[in-house]
Amino acid sequence: MTFDPTSDRLYIQDVTLRDGMHAILHMYGTDSVRTIAKALDEAGVDAIEVSHGDGLNGSTFNYGFGAHTDWDWIEAAADVIKNAVLTTLLVPGIGTAEELKRAYSMGVRSVRVATHCTEADVGKQHIGIARDLGMDVSGFLMMSHMIEPEALAQQALLMESYGAHCVYVTDSGGALDMDGVIARLQAYDRVLKPETQRGIHAHHNLSLGVANSIVAAQAGAVRIDASLAGMGAGAGNAPLEVFIAAANRKGWKHGCDVMALMDAADDIIRPLQDRPVRVDRETLSLGYAGVYSSFLRHAEKAAEQYGIDTREILVELGNRRMVGGQEDMIIDVALDLIKAKAN
């Protein structure tokens, strides 16, 4: 895709109010949602994603119950957003067509349909319904590090064929490096239409969230996911204010006020964190083992319950190639580790 961030405008997609849910166990209050959404809107981001961390209808026993419903959160954000595109995320099998239609009725105009990187076909119906509603639609290929670039590109091609306007390289495990990101976007270029946008969703588990987003833009990614103070699963997403500062230094075009983003990150977001969103031994283990970032809090809970090291659980999850949706297996892994030690 021919895209030059020095002459073409980046599309900055904030994920503080969706991926950021994972960082505080989906406990955002509606007042906080209003405050954050207003700050983001005034700072000039292009789109603001709002839902449970696991997407529409994600508030369940398996993923964790939210402090409010998706509808409460979406309504709170819609009350204050004046310019940004209200966006949500849907994982087929968790969210349904009915939730998608309800979100649209509440003002959501963009959706990311998220599947595991080998399962683009399960998003066909939801992408089609979103297009029929007139929504902007992105295909979101989660855990993109788990398959080779050419295989990922074939999945991206499916999402394009279903009607996605944009297809993401989604580094859910924060396990990709810059070469891996570039290789995947170059593979996209070999099969996707020039008019289909590319996107990058980075996690910071190896401290490469910003670097991966920078090289993604240089490789043709128009849409850049990021969050205030990196608020997100694991070590968080690419920190929005940091990415924008780096983009400014490169002379790239976007609509964001970096100072306003810095203020929102430090004054609004960091005080909400009950566990610091940072690279530490546990979150580093996510990227090292290539594990789904939202497993972090579940694994820490299991480790505390059974008296074992969180890192052991995370590494074993990586060895077993567990993916999003298998949160219920974390307890099984912990018990297997205890049994192995006893023997």
From Swiss-Prot:
EC number, as in UniProt: 4.1.3.39
Cited SUPFAM superfamilies: Aldolase (SSF51569), post-HMGL domain-like (SSF89000)
Biological processes, Gene Ontology terms: catabolic process; L-leucine biosynthetic process
Amino acids binding substrate: 18-19, 172, 201, 292
A Pfam entry, by short name: HMGL-like
GO MF terms held by the record: 2-isopropylmalate synthase activity; 4-hydroxy-2-oxovalerate aldolase activity; manganese ion binding
Catalyzed reactions per annotation: (S)-4-hydroxy-2-oxopentanoate = acetaldehyde + pyruvate
Transition state stabilizer, annotated site positions: 18
Cited Gene3D superfamilies: 1.10.8.60, Aldolase class I (3.20.20.70)
Signal peptide start-end: none
Record: active site: 22
Keyword terms of this UniProt record: Aromatic hydrocarbons catabolism, Lyase, Manganese, Metal-binding, Plasmid
Similarity comment: family membership: Belongs to the 4-hydroxy-2-oxovalerate aldolase family.
Protein name: 4-hydroxy-2-oxovalerate aldolase 2
Organism: Novosphingobium aromaticivorans (strain ATCC 700278 / DSM 12444 / CCUG 56034 / CIP 105152 / NBRC 16084 / F199)
